[in-house]
Protein backbone atom coordinates (compact mmCIF):
# COMPACT_ATOMS: atom_id res chain seq x y z
CA UNK A 1 0.00 0.00 0.00
CA UNK A 2 1.44 3.37 -0.99
CA UNK A 3 1.82 6.35 1.30
CA UNK A 4 -0.57 9.25 0.78
CA UNK A 5 1.26 12.57 0.52
CA UNK A 6 0.49 15.42 2.90
CA UNK A 7 -0.71 17.46 -0.10
CA UNK A 8 -3.16 14.72 -1.14
CA UNK A 9 -4.39 14.39 2.45
CA UNK A 10 -4.98 18.13 2.65
CA UNK A 11 -6.80 18.16 -0.71
CA UNK A 12 -9.05 15.36 0.50
CA UNK A 13 -9.86 17.18 3.75
CA UNK A 14 -10.61 20.39 1.82
CA UNK A 15 -12.99 18.50 -0.47
CA UNK A 16 -15.06 17.48 2.56
CA UNK A 17 -15.44 20.97 4.06
CA UNK A 18 -18.98 22.13 3.38
CA UNK A 19 -19.80 25.59 2.03
CA UNK A 20 -23.07 27.28 2.96
CA UNK A 21 -23.79 30.67 1.38
CA UNK A 22 -25.70 33.25 3.42
CA UNK A 23 -25.22 31.45 6.73
CA UNK A 24 -25.49 32.48 9.51
CA UNK A 25 -26.52 35.71 7.77
CA UNK A 26 -26.77 37.24 4.31
CA UNK A 27 -23.44 37.76 2.58
CA UNK A 28 -21.48 35.20 4.65
CA UNK A 29 -20.02 32.03 3.10
CA UNK A 30 -19.87 29.59 6.03
CA UNK A 31 -17.23 26.87 5.76
CA UNK A 32 -18.22 23.85 7.85
CA UNK A 33 -15.55 21.56 9.31
CA UNK A 34 -18.20 19.00 10.30
CA UNK A 35 -18.24 17.63 6.73
CA UNK A 36 -14.62 16.57 7.15
CA UNK A 37 -15.26 15.13 10.61
CA UNK A 38 -18.09 12.88 9.44
CA UNK A 39 -15.81 11.23 6.87
CA UNK A 40 -13.52 8.69 8.60
CA UNK A 41 -10.72 9.05 6.05
CA UNK A 42 -10.81 12.87 6.21
CA UNK A 43 -10.79 12.69 10.01
CA UNK A 44 -7.70 10.46 10.03
CA UNK A 45 -5.97 12.67 7.44
CA UNK A 46 -6.75 15.79 9.45
CA UNK A 47 -5.32 14.20 12.59
CA UNK A 48 -2.24 13.07 10.65
CA UNK A 49 -1.62 16.55 9.22
CA UNK A 50 -1.97 18.28 12.58
CA UNK A 51 0.19 15.73 14.42
CA UNK A 52 2.88 15.84 11.72
CA UNK A 53 2.98 19.63 11.84
CA UNK A 54 3.26 19.76 15.64
CA UNK A 55 5.96 17.06 15.70
CA UNK A 56 8.02 19.00 13.16
CA UNK A 57 7.41 22.53 14.40
CA UNK A 58 6.96 22.16 18.17
CA UNK A 59 8.44 18.83 19.34
CA UNK A 60 8.86 20.20 22.87
CA UNK A 61 5.09 20.72 23.37
CA UNK A 62 3.77 19.44 26.71
CA UNK A 63 0.09 20.43 26.56
CA UNK A 64 -2.46 20.82 23.76
CA UNK A 65 -5.11 23.44 24.55
CA UNK A 66 -8.48 23.28 22.79
CA UNK A 67 -11.07 26.04 22.58
CA UNK A 68 -14.79 25.70 23.26
CA UNK A 69 -16.36 24.10 21.31
CA UNK A 70 -15.21 22.91 17.88
CA UNK A 71 -11.61 22.92 19.11
CA UNK A 72 -12.60 20.00 21.34
CA UNK A 73 -13.41 17.77 18.38
CA UNK A 74 -9.89 16.67 17.53
CA UNK A 75 -7.59 17.96 20.26
CA UNK A 76 -7.84 14.95 22.57
CA UNK A 77 -6.85 12.77 19.59
CA UNK A 78 -3.84 15.01 18.96
CA UNK A 79 -2.72 14.98 22.59
CA UNK A 80 -3.06 11.20 22.79
CA UNK A 81 -1.15 10.67 19.55
CA UNK A 82 1.60 13.07 20.70
CA UNK A 83 1.76 11.63 24.22
CA UNK A 84 1.11 15.00 25.88
CA UNK A 85 -1.56 16.50 28.12
CA UNK A 86 -4.78 18.12 26.96
CA UNK A 87 -6.80 20.86 28.59
CA UNK A 88 -9.88 22.75 27.43
CA UNK A 89 -10.61 26.45 27.49
CA UNK A 90 -14.34 26.83 28.05
CA UNK A 91 -16.99 29.50 28.01
CA UNK A 92 -17.75 31.11 31.37
CA UNK A 93 -19.37 28.91 34.01
CA UNK A 94 -18.54 25.51 32.46
CA UNK A 95 -15.44 24.56 34.48
CA UNK A 96 -15.28 23.40 38.11
CA UNK A 97 -12.74 24.62 40.62
CA UNK A 98 -10.67 27.78 40.60
CA UNK A 99 -10.51 29.39 37.16
CA UNK A 100 -8.90 32.37 35.48
CA UNK A 101 -11.00 34.38 33.03
CA UNK A 102 -10.53 36.64 30.03
CA UNK A 103 -13.22 38.63 28.28
CA UNK A 104 -12.82 38.92 24.52
CA UNK A 105 -14.57 40.70 21.69
CA UNK A 106 -16.77 39.03 19.12
CA UNK A 107 -18.07 40.54 15.91
CA UNK A 108 -21.19 41.64 17.81
CA UNK A 109 -20.52 41.86 21.54
CA UNK A 110 -18.22 39.98 23.88
CA UNK A 111 -17.80 36.64 25.62
CA UNK A 112 -15.63 35.18 28.38
CA UNK A 113 -13.24 32.23 28.27
CA UNK A 114 -12.05 30.38 31.37
CA UNK A 115 -9.22 27.98 32.16
CA UNK A 116 -8.76 25.95 35.35
CA UNK A 117 -5.90 27.54 37.28
CA UNK A 118 -4.09 24.20 37.80
CA UNK A 119 -4.62 22.81 34.28
CA UNK A 120 -1.25 24.11 33.06
CA UNK A 121 1.80 24.25 35.28
CA UNK A 122 4.14 27.26 35.24
CA UNK A 123 6.64 26.88 32.42
CA UNK A 124 4.73 24.18 30.55
CA UNK A 125 4.96 24.53 26.77
CA UNK A 126 1.59 24.80 25.04
CA UNK A 127 0.20 24.62 21.51
CA UNK A 128 -3.30 26.07 21.14
CA UNK A 129 -5.36 24.28 18.49
CA UNK A 130 -8.71 25.42 17.08
CA UNK A 131 -10.80 24.84 13.99
CA UNK A 132 -10.85 28.42 12.70
CA UNK A 133 -8.99 31.72 12.78
CA UNK A 134 -11.33 34.55 11.81
CA UNK A 135 -11.01 37.84 13.71
CA UNK A 136 -8.44 36.45 16.17
CA UNK A 137 -10.31 37.35 19.36
CA UNK A 138 -10.72 33.83 20.72
CA UNK A 139 -7.11 32.76 20.03
CA UNK A 140 -5.79 35.97 21.58
CA UNK A 141 -7.91 35.35 24.70
CA UNK A 142 -6.69 31.75 24.86
CA UNK A 143 -3.05 32.90 24.71
CA UNK A 144 -3.71 35.38 27.50
CA UNK A 145 -5.27 32.67 29.69
CA UNK A 146 -2.36 30.28 29.16
CA UNK A 147 0.10 33.02 30.13
CA UNK A 148 -1.99 34.00 33.19
CA UNK A 149 -1.41 30.55 34.68
CA UNK A 150 2.29 30.57 33.74
CA UNK A 151 2.20 28.51 30.55
CA UNK A 152 4.40 29.26 27.54
CA UNK A 153 2.51 29.57 24.24
CA UNK A 154 4.68 28.04 21.53
CA UNK A 155 2.17 28.46 18.72
CA UNK A 156 -1.47 28.55 17.68
CA UNK A 157 -2.52 26.02 15.06
CA UNK A 158 -5.82 26.18 13.17
CA UNK A 159 -7.43 24.02 10.52
CA UNK A 160 -8.91 26.96 8.57
CA UNK A 161 -8.03 30.65 8.37
CA UNK A 162 -10.22 33.37 6.85
CA UNK A 163 -7.34 35.58 5.69
CA UNK A 164 -9.55 38.52 4.67
CA UNK A 165 -10.46 39.14 8.31
CA UNK A 166 -6.80 39.76 9.33
CA UNK A 167 -7.15 37.87 12.63
CA UNK A 168 -3.51 36.80 12.46
CA UNK A 169 -2.41 40.42 12.92
CA UNK A 170 -4.02 40.54 16.39
CA UNK A 171 -2.14 37.52 17.69
CA UNK A 172 1.02 37.70 19.75
CA UNK A 173 2.36 34.24 18.93
CA UNK A 174 3.38 32.16 15.94
CA UNK A 175 0.34 30.96 13.95
CA UNK A 176 -0.04 28.19 11.38
CA UNK A 177 -3.14 27.32 9.37
CA UNK A 178 -3.58 24.19 7.27
CA UNK A 179 -6.13 25.77 4.93
CA UNK A 180 -6.49 29.43 3.96
CA UNK A 181 -9.61 30.95 2.44
Swiss-Prot record:
Similarity section: Belongs to the purine/pyrimidine phosphoribosyltransferase family.
- HAMAP family associated with the record: Aden_phosphoribosyltr
Keyword Membrane applies: no
Which gene specifies this protein's sequence? Aprt
Q: What this chain does, per the record?
A: Catalyzes a salvage reaction resulting in the formation of AMP, that is energically less costly than de novo synthesis.
How it assembles, according to the record, is: Homodimer.
Keywords from UniProt, A to Z, are: Cytoplasm, Glycosyltransferase, Purine salvage, Transferase
GO:BP terms for this protein?
adenine salvage; AMP salvage; purine ribonucleoside salvage
Q: What class of enzyme is it?
A: transferase
The protein's annotated pathway: Purine metabolism; AMP biosynthesis via salvage pathway; AMP from adenine: step 1/1
Q: Which GO-annotated molecular functions does the record name?
A: adenine binding; adenine phosphoribosyltransferase activity; AMP binding
Q: Which InterPro entries match?
A: Ade_phspho_trans, PRibTrfase_dom, PRTase-like, UPRTase/APRTase
Enzyme Commission number(s) of this protein: 2.4.2.7
UniProt-recorded name of the protein: Adenine phosphoribosyltransferase
Organism of this sequence: Drosophila pseudoobscura pseudoobscura
According to UniProt, the reaction catalysed is: AMP + diphosphate = 5-phospho-alpha-D-ribose 1-diphosphate + adenine
Q: Which GO terms describe its cellular component?
A: cytoplasm
Q: Where in the cell is it found?
A: Cytoplasm
Amino acid sequence: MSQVSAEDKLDYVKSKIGEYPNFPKEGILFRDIFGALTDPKACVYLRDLLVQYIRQSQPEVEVIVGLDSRGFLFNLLLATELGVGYTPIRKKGKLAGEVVSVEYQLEYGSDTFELQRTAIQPGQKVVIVDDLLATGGSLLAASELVRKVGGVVLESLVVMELVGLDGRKKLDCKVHSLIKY
